[in-house]
Design a protein with these regions (language model features):
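Short, contiguous strand/loop micro-motifs
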Residues: 27-28, 45, 62-63, 104-105, ...
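A general structural signal marking secondary-structure boundaries and capping sites
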Residues: 24-25, 61-65, 175
Length: 182
């Protein structure tokens, strides 16, 4: 696999994120949830944002380290970003996420991108942990997180997805765990 790197976008690169959020295949994992989020379509999982809303989002998210970080994922052999990673402080825990554009899924990008995010979070920004809550039926996602050093904790959430109960569990990696792996 080619070299992966993370790059914080400039304001003129917001259209990538805006397009991914509208893409049915990229956002299909997000469908069925009862989210109170402006622009969210429960049937498709897509999220629609105006240009003005994207600029407001950008001003709230970009260059807010160490508590908030957002970057695009790049493969040096591909001219445009293939996805995004982020984390943010949420009740004393840094919640995080990763999104790979649909056409690049299944190629190992998640694992390598998680390693890059860990390096920035723990080595550059000195945060103590990264955490995500992932539905147990997303086996490939869980596999990538565990390969990158995350472990399941006892914290779980039950959510309704299209009226059916879904269980999601926390995956967590601490700075100490990260340092022991390196």
């Amino acid at each position: 696999m080619s070299k992966i790197y993370l790059k914080v976008p400039n304001i003129h690169e917001l259209y990538y994120r805006q397009e991914w959020m509208k893409d049915l295949k990229t956002m299909s994992y997000n469908s069925g949830y009862d989210m109170d989020l402006k622009g969210y379509n429960k049937q498709t999982g897509t999220i629609t944002r105006t240009d003005e809303e994207m600029i407001t989002w950008y001003n709230n998210w970009i260059n807010k380290e160490p508590d908030r970080y957002f970057a695009y994922i790049y493969d040096k052999d591909i001219e445009e970003p293939i996805g995004e990673v982020y984390y943010y402080l949420n009740n004393d825990v840094h919640s995080m996420g990763i999104l790979i554009q649909n056409k690049y899924r299944g190629k190992g990008y998640s694992y390598i991108s998680l390693l890059e995010l860990e390096k920035i979070a723990f080595e550059k920004n000195g945060i103590n942990e990264l955490s995500d809550i992932i539905p147990l039926d997303r086996m490939n996602t869980i596999k990538s997180f565990k390969k990158a050093g995350f472990i399941h904790t006892d914290l779980e959430q039950k959510e309704l997805v299209f009226g059916k109960e879904s269980i999601a569990k926390q995956l967590l990696i601490t700075r100490e765990m990260y340092m022991e792996m390196r």
